[in-house]
Amino acid sequence: MLPDAKLDILLARHAALEAELLGQLNAEAYVRATRELAELTPVVDAVKAYRAGASELSDLDAMIDDPTTDAEMRAMAESERPVLQERQENLEQQIRIALLPKDAMDERNVVLEVRAGTGGDEASLFAGDLFRMYERFAALQGWKVEVISASEGTVGGYKEIVAQVQGRGAFAKLKFESGVHRVQRVPDTEASGRIHTSAATVAVLPEAEEIDIDIKDTDLRIETMRAQGAGGQHVNKTESAIRITHIPTGIVVMMQDSRSQHKNRASAMNILRSRILDAERQRAASERSADRRGQVGSGDRSERVRTYNFPQGRVTDHRINLTLYKLPQVIAGEALNELIDALTTEHQAALLATETSA
């Protein structure tokens, strides 16, 4: 049974927003109210349909139980009841999911970090493949991707690449991508046709805002230096590169992609805030670990999450034991949503189980 009090609050909030939008609002308040109304409308429609269905179901039961109902009408009611019951159960599940506690970071932009792991040059190439997969996936969502820093591999791909993904709900979609991604394929340089296994690590951080993290100047050690090229040689004469160390956590960010020290510092601080925020989220999650059994992945960067097997054309997500024989479509970003949707569904099921047992 759904909690009527919660549903009444939801309906009241929806009505209040509709009334608010009929009044005089400034631009910021109008955007906020419109966005919240758009989020609430689908679940409010489901609640109204659910309540109408409950009334209809009650009428059918009364008709079936009434001894004066003629045989034809009773037979019709009995045939309609299972269909209506199934629709009610689907609506109830939809509403329960909508009422689950929301991750406050789900609507945030993302700082995406992809790093080559074990496997040498092949790992760098795979890191490049992964980044392009996310880049194309983001484009399909209508999001914007901006590279913040990149260290290219010797034969292509990336040793490390950091980018900002800007778009509504970016973190909600991408947060389950964090972890170790493994690839199995025959490198172009492998004459014997032997399959090599390489890995890359993906970190998806919700972009922090200044109000999220209070960073004192005294907690920072800031060093400037001349930017260096791939071979270690200095590529400009000014000290535009910057390295910032957050002393309490030991988190270090170095930025040198821009010729402007000011831009490098701003980018480094943005990443630093996001990493500190992520570290705090990870710590809080580990403290709740006893309550998180069965949820999708731990978010641990060392957790192996997915294997891409090129010879067999398959992708396996180890957290939910899902295998898709759509590797070209996944790596092109086109079928990545199938994995993300399955992970989200599993996560929601785990949350529902926790809520039910609470």
Swiss-Prot record:
It holds the Pfam family PCRF. It is found in: Cytoplasm. Disulfide bonds: none annotated. Residues 282-306 have a biased composition (Basic and acidic residues). The modification N5-methylglutamine is found at residue 233. GO terms for cellular component: cytoplasm. Methylated by PrmC. Methylation increases the termination efficiency of RF1. It comes from the Bacteria. Keywords: Cytoplasm, Methylation, Protein biosynthesis. Its main location: cytoplasm. InterPro entries: PCRF, Pep_chain_release_fac_I, Pep_chain_release_fac_I_sf, Prokaryotic/Mito_RF, RF-1. One of its GO terms (molecular function) is translation release factor activity, codon specific. The keyword Cytoplasm applies. Residues 282-308 are annotated as: Disordered. Belongs to the prokaryotic/mitochondrial release factor family. Peptide chain release factor 1 directs the termination of translation in response to the peptide chain termination codons UAG and UAA. This is Peptide chain release factor 1.
